[in-house]
Amino acid sequence: MGTAEARKYIQELRRKQENPYLWPDFLTGLPDKPAILKKLGEAFPKLGKYSIAYVRIANIHPYLIKYGPDRHADIIQWAAAILKTTCEKCRNCFVGTVSTHDFIIMCESKDMGGHIREAGRIFKKRIEAYYSKEDLQKKTALSFIRNGERINVGLMRLITVIADNKVHTEKSRLIHDMGRVCEALETTDDDIVVMNNAMICKGR
């Protein structure tokens, strides 16, 4: 590579660095934290018209304990692809990855519920390929006794916390707070919850 080519490479690199939307996560191809923060700055003042969703692949750790890590990347990529292609059906829908198993969606409030439900249905169908027939029939990945009580851990699913109205938190804390609510949601049978101020206060 000569000087001219090297200079062109650096110019292209710097152009991309000026726009965080061009910094995709290697595993998923989705925009990562810099792009999420930039988009959050646009969406947060418009909560109500726009919604922000925090989506997690629930019960993936029990799956990895039982079945091993061989298909770990494949599961993450399928979740990302399902969320991305589902949300592409409407204008101005943003999908990014905030951590290994967690994603952020931002779009108009009128579209969010439909996106989330459709993505959940598609993912539920897709994960059938990762479990044994026995686990699918029982809808349980792991089962064990804790303090004399039988604990059954279900199959992987997408769970979502949605912020669609102003909540009593700063923009800089919103994603952190949504992630914390998502952790609590994972211990329930619910797939979707709309975030409120009581949920934020409970965890602080």
Model-derived features: where do they sit?
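Catalytic/regulatory signature loops of cyclic-dinucleotide turnover enzymes
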Residues: 128, 158-159, 164-202
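Short beta-strand-to-loop capping motifs
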Residues: 57, 105-110, 164-165
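Alpha-helix-centered segments that form part of catalytic cores
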Residues: 146-162
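Conserved helix-loop-beta segment at the catalytic/binding core of cyclic-nucleotide signaling proteins
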Residues: 80-113, 128-142
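Conserved long alpha-helical elements within nucleotide-processing catalytic cores of c-di-GMP signaling
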Residues: 23-24, 29-41, 47-51, 58-84, ...
